[in-house]
């Protein structure tokens, strides 16, 4: 597996993963274009030159970042790809001086919540009906400090 920068020409392949994993709640091409245009940090994980996962990080303030998303193709889940992407994002947050990292995760996504807990994220609250149109709640998690 190789982790590298997500570039504009990767967006169509990323959208295929988005559609499969998130259906009507998927991000659009314009959303990814916007993230890249704002200079946010986006990475892809590839195997045999195919994208198998991706993740993004945005700096909110000089010392605070948010994990925008992490997603792994269904047929490649449970292989450590999401963890590798998370480590990459956390390392970049530390390089940029972010000492507080925030993320939202669906309340019904226990595997992701467990991964985030292993990396020092703790629950901070619930955002009701965060994911639309399903109305699924999101658990907000926060990581303070720099130990990855």
Predicted regions and their residues:
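Extreme N-terminal starter segment of soluble prokaryotic enzymes
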Residues: 1-3
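Short acidic/polar active-site loop segments enriched in Thr and Asp
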Residues: 63, 99, 122
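Conserved GNAT acetyl-CoA-binding A-motif
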Residues: 93-104, 127
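Conserved catalytic-core motifs of GNAT/GCN5-like acyltransferases
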Residues: 104, 117, 122-138
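Divalent-cation-assisted or electrostatically stabilized phosphate/pyrophosphate-binding catalytic cores
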Residues: 141
